[in-house]
UniProtKB/Swiss-Prot annotation:
HAMAP family: Coq4 (MF_03111). This is Ubiquinone biosynthesis protein COQ4, mitochondrial. PANTHER family: UBIQUINONE BIOSYNTHESIS PROTEIN, UBIQUINONE BIOSYNTHESIS PROTEIN COQ4 HOMOLOG, MITOCHONDRIAL. It is a peripheral membrane protein.
Amino acid sequence: MLRLSLLRSTATLPVKCQRRGLILPAAAMYTLGSLIFGKEARLADAMERGELHNKNVDYAKEAEERTELRIRALANTRPMEPRYNGHVPLHRYEKLLLFAISGWNSFFHPEDGYNIVQLGEATALPVFLENLKQTMLSDSSGRRILKEQPNITTEILHMDKLAKLPHNTFGYVYYQWLKRENVSPDTRAPVKFIDDPMHAYISKRYRQCHDFYHAITNMPIIIEGEITIKALEGANLGVPMAILGGILAPLRLKKVQRKRLYNIYLPWAVRTGLSCKPLINVYWEEMLEKDVTALRKELKITLPPDLRTMRKERAALRKEIDAKYNSQKRATTPA
């Protein structure tokens, strides 16, 4: 009996050892998992209750102070303190870099308005802006604009009212032009790199009035239209960037576009710019209910040939010529 019992015990020993070998690692894994995941669960609960943070510390205030320190550190690298909201003072070498980079980008990517804006500020020399200020000070409307410093926005212009004006008014013409070109007066970028606050406002006013020049001359915002209006601004106001644009921008156009500009639109822009009233002195917001034809006559602005119509006529002519060519080609090609 004793021998039989020993044999049975010996036979079952490997099975028990095997079970123990499985149970011990499983228990170890369970214990380790409980420690890890239990700790994470307790950590999450503590975070939710706010027990992890020092309740005596104002974290929002600390973040604000860190931001203020970074701003001060950056301000210490500037040549002067900001002189108006959004002003970014630049060193001379930074202004030269801005001119070089924005000029390069404007030439190769004129469709990007941000490049044009930067080039405009880089070339807006104080002597030019001071001359423009004197032009405004010499005129009663210009003086009022400088004193009141109006800001042109859709809210100020009341676009819903412009849509209901008589069709012969400048306001309705302007409203229709905005709709046709799918633009808004609210999209004008703020001035940042001009140091003198008054000069900055004059630059802002010039920028915001740009669409009025387009509307009163019925000029679209395609590249040819933009070059034409820039040439008008250059002749009328002496804007350096506008003069550069009128000279250099046509070089990248197609031959037919350059021909249109050189033969029709640039001569018109220069003549009109030199003969019409300084457009920077026009209080456009007060002209919206005026008859557009009378306003053009008052400002001595004559309309150029419709650029949209000329482009459509040329496209139709080219389509007709292509159709005739293809028809003749098919007729002469053997079956």
